[in-house]
Curated annotation (Swiss-Prot):
Biological process per Gene Ontology, one example term: mycotoxin biosynthetic process
A cellular component annotation (GO) from this entry: membrane
The name this protein goes by in its record: Cytochrome P450 monooxygenase ptmG
Cofactor: heme
């Protein structure tokens, strides 16, 4: 029987409503099941932390609430590991404690015990947690990450495996010191104009210049008004911060890759130029590349067979290019350390006086005498005991942050208890380890004398480890210490430095630098605002 036309519209409307309701009910069921599954999964994860040492723990939200409460009292860009260390202090947590940040991260175990840190890094030879350094791609090529993934890479590497020693770096000191004349002239000009400058930026340029000298054996002109090197370096590294945000990275990545390719091309060209300039086929001016070329010409690298006496193989050239990018970028992390050293010395004038006295007694009391001393006897740097101690104490107070490891074992023993650490991120927390009062008395105080030979209270074994040990240790630590000594020696003789933050600037906890609190807004941990400073010529 046909439905009257007058009834068609109501029936159609009813049918559509029933269809929509049915579809809605169909969609609600899987969504509800998904929500139930997520709640059960989260509850299961949270229960795993029930009997573990940890800060106060929310049954459903884990440790997000307590970290967020702490963050509300701090500057927004503060370095995240400092927040964890403040929580550790507030709740007097032990040297091993756990954080539950699921689902953003796997369970994290924070370690600040030197013996346990030694076992994980040196005895178990655990590797760095996957993806830690990949955040620097494309500034550092993927080739470099594949290289360092090899446990034995430091033995066969065509640069690190040849002449990467403190004795070899000391031979480069005279040229490094000469290359800093331009920096000293720049500081002199800023003093005349009473100009405020960014210390972290100056230190970065200085370390870039000295690292380039060590690697290529040539001056990079990093303090020239339009330096090709500093421009290419900053263009390749500035996007690192924005790219850490997964929502911004897709928009940043195309231009970042373009700038990275330009940076790598500049390095590649310099490597080729260095090889072509080595006319005598032997290392003349001491440099890492000169030593590597000497071995290469003798066909001494099985992984990189020589093409001819006059040419570099493509593989060898690319290895040296990726290594150069990694070294130049990695070395500049020392800029934050040297910046904090200037800040701490300004805050402790008595220590600064002792340091200048040491510089004068060992190398002389003016620029010319220091440069002459370093030219004739570069090993004099080894006699700067207090300078070395100042740098070690600065690294203790302002380390580069925790080292994340992936342990090969499924359990970890500490103080008679066994912990299940399967699928855990193991974080060796230098910020916590270096400020333990039982290891470093009065740990928040700047006291470089504790590192002098014959100190009344010796530093416990494995307690000071800013460069880390075992797999993933900093291969450039000897070069970094030499560079920072040279910079302190040349600058403190002529200049006084003082921080110049605006009154309205954000301020972090005083124990972490106050206005110069450590941020995560650089390649690595960086003083807030790059540590603005004013420089004055010293009164003679």
């Amino acid at each position: 029987m046909a439905i009257p036309k007058t009834m068609e519209a109501p029936f159609t409307h009813l049918f559509l409503n029933l269809t929509v309701m049915t579809l809605g009910q169909i969609l609600v069921i899987p969504v509800a099941l998904l929500v139930v599954y997520i709640c059960i999964r989260i509850g299961s994860i949270r229960r795993q932390f029930r009997d573990l040492p940890k800060p106060p723990h929310h049954a459903f939200l884990g440790h997000f609430p307590i970290l967020l409460r702490e963050l509300r009292t701090l500057p927004r860009d503060i370095f995240a590991p400092l927040v964890v260390d403040l929580v550790r202090r507030k709740f007097d947590l032990p040297a091993v404690f756990f954080l539950d940040l699921y689902p953003l991260f796997n369970p994290i175990v924070f370690i600040s015990d030197p013996g346990l840190a030694r076992k994980i890094t040196q005895e178990d030879r655990s590797l760095r947690y996957p993806g830690v350094f990949e955040t620097l791609y494309p500034a550092i090529p993927t080739r470099w990450f594949r290289t360092v993934a090899d446990r034995a890479w430091t033995k066969w590497h065509p640069v690190v495996g040849v002449s990467f020693t403190a004795a070899h770096f000391v031979r480069m000191v005279p040229q490094m010191a000469e290359d800093l004349r331009a920096m000293l002239d720049q500081l002199n000009d800023w003093s005349d104009r009473d100009e405020i400058f960014c210390m972290e930026r100056v230190a970065t340029d200085a370390i870039l210049a000295m690292t380039g000298r060590a690697y290529f054996g040539m001056e990079l002109d990093c303090f020239a008004p339009k330096s090709q090197w500093t421009s290419a370096f900053r263009a390749a590294t500035t996007p690192v911060v924005a790219a850490r945000n997964p929502l911004r990275k897709p928009f940043v990545l195309p231009s970042w890759k373009r700038h990275a390719r330009t940076f790598h091309a500049v390095i590649r060209e310099k490597v080729q130029h260095t090889f072509d300039k080595d006319e005598n086929h032997e290392a003349g001016v001491p440099s890492l590349l000169a030593s590597s070329f000497a071995v290469y010409r003798k066909n001494g690298f099985p992984e990189f067979p020589r093409v001819s006496q006059e040419a570099l193989s493509t593989e060898y050239l690319e290895e040296l290019t990726s290594t150069g990018a990694a070294f130049l970028i990695g070395a500049t992390s020392g800029a934050s350390v040297i910046s904090y050293a200037f800040l701490l010395l300004h805050q402790h004038p008595n220590i600064l006086d002792d340091l200048r006295r040491e510089h004068g007694q060992v190398c002389g009391f003016n620029r010319q005498s220091i440069l002459l001393a370093l030219q004739s006897r570069p090993r004099l740097l080894n006699d700067l005991k207090l300078t070395h101690a100042v740098l070690k104490e600065t690294l203790r107070l302002f380390p580069m942050g925790p080292v994340l490891r992936k342990c090969p074992s499924e359990t970890m023993e500490y103080e008679g208890r066994t912990y299940d650490i399967r699928n855990h991120i193991v974080a060796i927390s230098h910020n916590s380890l270096h400020r333990r009062p039982d290891l470093f008395p009065n740990p928040d105080a700047f006291n470089p004398y504790r590192f002098l030979p014959g100190a009344a209270i010796p530093i416990p074994a494995d307690a000071w480890r800013p460069f880390e040990k075992g797999n993933g240790y900093c291969v450039g630590q000897e070069l970094a210490m030499i560079q920072m000594k040279v910079m302190l020696l040349l600058t403190l003789t002529e200049f006084d430095f003082q921080p110049k933050y605006a009154r309205e600037a954000a301020r972090g906890p005083d124990i972490y630098g106050g206005y110069a609190y450590t941020t995560g807004s650089g390649i690595g941990p960086t003083p807030a605002g790059g540590l603005p400073m004013r420089v004055d010529k010293r009164m003679k």
